[in-house]
From Swiss-Prot:
Belongs to the glycosyl hydrolase 99 family. GO terms for cellular component: Golgi membrane. Residues 60-462 are annotated as: Catalytic. This is Glycoprotein endo-alpha-1,2-mannosidase. It is a single-pass type II membrane protein. GO terms for molecular function: glycoprotein endo-alpha-1,2-mannosidase activity. It comes from Pongo abelii. The gene is MANEA. The chain crosses the membrane at residues 9-29.
Length: 462
């Protein structure tokens, strides 16, 4: 009997050892990219893989929201937990849609939080006073108080993030790529210079270029109206940008009709500077001319009023863009004027770049500006703008914006959020990625249509 028990124990021990060895072997087969709960070999099933990615993001958001809620309960606001994308959400480039380098999006890197910057930046934007004291007294004053109270009518899926967080930059590039956007126009101030509510951001450019290159995106520069901007310091700043960043593989160049590939610079509020000053920089006879030099480029002026057309010609600019996402707000942003603007540009050999946006609402920072709010209508407003832009057969289209949250023009993912004082807008009944999906749809349509009319208009096609 004892021998039988001993034999049984030996067999049982060998069986347990076999099961343990089998489990260890299966564990070794599990792919490195699998997240918790992901069965091994899931990458072989793309549809399941994508579904798991989506669920993983939902889990991360719920976790982040719970952390923020607990933080508020304890009144601890010194640290913001920035949501990290899971490894499973890193898609292969082969799984992403083709790029459209004729579709640009305006991108802002001015956000900050305590975790990466020691304080909140831009999320705590002040409420701006109306210039008429009689109107101003009817509205609240002060600053927003993140993370639950931010200077936006929508709430980001990533929370009140920092533009310095590498994982945030990575997520942004992935979202742009998923939307078939080829070029981001980076809001830019010279080194050690910043907007009145921010901090210097030029030191972020190398990381943004590197992350963009990972997704085969290109970066162009949207030069902001820094203090005392003129022909001389513009020359120095253009030289700085090209010398420092021009050799990076993600640095954007546009191939002109003559076959030259030149850097492109959007110049915000260009009308502030007199045409004579611009002509010093942008005409061949100018005293600070960049023309036919290593620092030559394509300079795109912001057209607000109709009269700016002739100032732009006199200045020597290479094209115009309209920026504002509010149809009817300015002459340039009004869809009905785009056809005539395109004819004007064709006549004078200028590049016409209409700017489209998903909507507009800035009442979180300008509560008195309700007349310029444009409802998104579940994506219809955006599609109307894109359709109007395509009808003009433009050389390029710009999107306002990827993440200008203060003015509610973002196509970045937003989520529902409610606090005791605020109910944020969101994209429901659609998913947080609605505007990325719509952008992808129209990018593909634009790419096909542009290929058909490019030869007739002698536009570059590569």
């Amino acid at each position: 009997m004892a021998k039988f028990r001993r034999g049984t124990c030996i067999i049982l021990a060998l069986f347990i050892l076999f099961i343990f060895s089998l489990m260890m072997g299966l564990k070794m087969l599990r792919p490195n990219t699998a997240t918790f709960g992901a069965p091994f070999g899931l990458d072989l099933l793309p549809e399941l893989h994508q579904r798991t990615v989506h669920l993983g993001k939902s889990f991360d958001f719920q976790k982040s929201d719970r952390i923020n809620s607990e933080t508020n309960t304890k009144n601890l606001k010194s640290v913001e937990i920035t949501m990290k994308p899971s490894k499973a959400s890193e898609l292969n480039l082969d799984e992403l849609p083709p790029l459209n380098n004729y579709l640009h999006v305006f991108y802002y890197s001015w956000y900050g939080n305590p975790q990466f910057d020691g304080k909140y930046i831009h999320w705590n934007h002040p409420v701006l006073e109306h210039w008429d004291p009689r109107i101003a007294k009817n509205y609240p004053q002060g600053r927003h108080n993140p993370p639950d109270d931010i200077g936006s009518s929508f709430y980001p899926e990533l929370g009140s993030y920092s533009s310095r967080d590498p994982s945030v930059i990575e997520t942004h590039m992935r979202q742009m790529r998923s939307a078939s956007i080829g070029v981001l126009a980076l809001s830019w101030y010279p080194p050690d210079v910043n907007d009145e509510n921010g901090e210097p951001t030029d030191n972020l450019v190398p990381t943004i270029l590197d992350k963009a290159h990972k997704y085969n995106l290109k970066v162009t520069f949207h030069i902001e109206p820094y203090s005392n901007r003129d022909d001389q310091n513009m020359y120095k700043n253009v030289k700085y940008i090209i010398d420092k960043y021009g050799n990076h593989p993600a640095f954007y160049r546009y191939k002109t009709k003559t076959g030259n590939a030149l850097p492109m610079f959007y110049v915000y509020d260009s009308y502030i500077t007199k045409p004579e000053k611009w002509a010093n920089l942008l005409t061949t006879s100018g005293s600070w001319s960049i023309r036919n030099s290593p620092y030559d480029g394509l300079f795109i002026a912001l057209l607000v009023e109709e009269k700016h057309k002739y100032d732009i010609l006199q200045s020597g600019f290479d094209g115009i863009y309209t920026y504002f996402a509010t149809n009817g707000f300015t002459y340039g942003s009004s869809h009905q004027n785009w056809a005539s603007l395109k004819l004007f540009c064709d006549k004078y050999n200028l590049i016409f770049i209409p700017s489209v946006g998903p909507g507009y609402i800035d009442t979180s920072i300008r509560p008195w500006n309700t007349q310029n709010t444009r409802n998104r209508i579940n994506g219809k407003y955006y599609e109307i703008a894109l359709s109007a832009a395509l009808q003009t057969h433009p050389s390029l289209i710009s999107i306002t914006s990827f993440n200008e949250w203060h003015e509610g023009t973002q196509i970045e993912k937003a989520v529902p959020k409610r606090t005791s004082n605020t109910v944020y807008l969101d994209y429901r009944p659609h998913k947080p990625g609605l505007y990325l999906e719509l952008t992808r749809k129209w990018s593909e349509k634009y790419s096909k249509e542009r290929a058909t009319y490019a030869l007739d208009h002698q536009l570059p096609v590569s």
